[in-house]
Amino acid sequence: MFDYIKGQLTKITAKYIVVEANGLGYIIYVANPYSFSDSVNQTLTIYLHQVIREDAHLLFGFHTENEKDVFLKLISVSGIGPMTALAIVAVDDNEGLVAAIDNSDIKYLMKFPKIGKKTAQQMILDLSGKFVTIPEGGQAQQMPKAKGNQQLDEAIEALLALGYKATELKKIRAFFEGTDDTAEQYIKSALKMLMKG
């Protein structure tokens, strides 16, 4: 089992990042890969959780230990797998998640990808009162704004990887078309919009 990895960030995709440590490149699934954009080719520390399956060993990474703690609590709930938990952690407002669980707000919880009524009820049952700390969200600094829509395309691709439907994301794309921002900021803004419905 791993607690964290310290190495050089060598690659960012819509679903994962690659960190090289001791000559090996580790694929690490993260909530918002583009939040690491300012750290490409730099040494960084990523907190890890390893999932071992019959067909694969997967690493899930987090900016902070608090993010990791939220993820671990989420995957302890029956019906929530690691990818669904990552999609929930990706939402910047984890205060909203904690409040929804503590206030039994099923409708709010059902806004997350792949969370139905039954799973939302199970989240409330299993996690109510269990969040002592709230994660700070992404720790990455903003990178300089890029021209064109490449950043928006990357953000949409990352949201698809988190489990959001293409039909939902058409509205997001239309809303942000013609704007100039980073993929990280597009993702944060889009997640807030998606959670509001």
UniProtKB/Swiss-Prot annotation:
Subcellular localization, as worded in the UniProt entry: Cytoplasm
UniProt name for this protein: Holliday junction branch migration complex subunit RuvA
GO molecular function per UniProt: ATP binding; four-way junction DNA binding; four-way junction helicase activity
Family, per entry: Belongs to the RuvA family.
HAMAP family: DNA_HJ_migration_RuvA
GO cellular component, one term: Holliday junction helicase complex
Region of interest: Flexible linker: 142-146
Region feature Domain I, mapped onto this chain: 1-63
Keyword Metal-binding recorded: no
Gene3D superfamilies (alphabetical): 5' to 3' exonuclease, C-terminal subdomain (1.10.150.20), DNA helicase RuvA subunit, C-terminal domain (1.10.8.10), Nucleic acid-binding proteins (2.40.50.140)
Chain intervals for the UniProt region annotation (Domain III): 147-197
Extent of the signal sequence: none
Keyword annotations from UniProtKB, A to Z: Cytoplasm, DNA damage, DNA recombination, DNA repair, DNA-binding
Record comment regarding domains: Has three domains with a flexible linker between the domains II and III and assumes an 'L' shape. Domain III is highly mobile and contacts RuvB.
CDD domains xref list: UBA_RuvA_C
Principal cellular location given in the protein's record: cytoplasm
GO BP of this protein: DNA recombination; DNA repair
Quaternary structure, from the entry: Homotetramer. Forms an RuvA(8)-RuvB(12)-Holliday junction (HJ) complex. HJ DNA is sandwiched between 2 RuvA tetramers; dsDNA enters through RuvA and exits via RuvB. An RuvB hexamer assembles on each DNA strand where it exits the tetramer. Each RuvB hexamer is contacted by two RuvA subunits (via domain III) on 2 adjacent RuvB subunits; this complex drives branch migration. In the full resolvosome a probable DNA-RuvA(4)-RuvB(12)-RuvC(2) complex forms which resolves the HJ.
InterPro entries the record matches: DNA_helicase_Holl-junc_RuvA_I, Hlx-hairpin-Hlx_DNA-bd_motif, NA-bd_OB-fold, RuvA, RuvA_2-like, RuvA_C, RuvA_C_sf
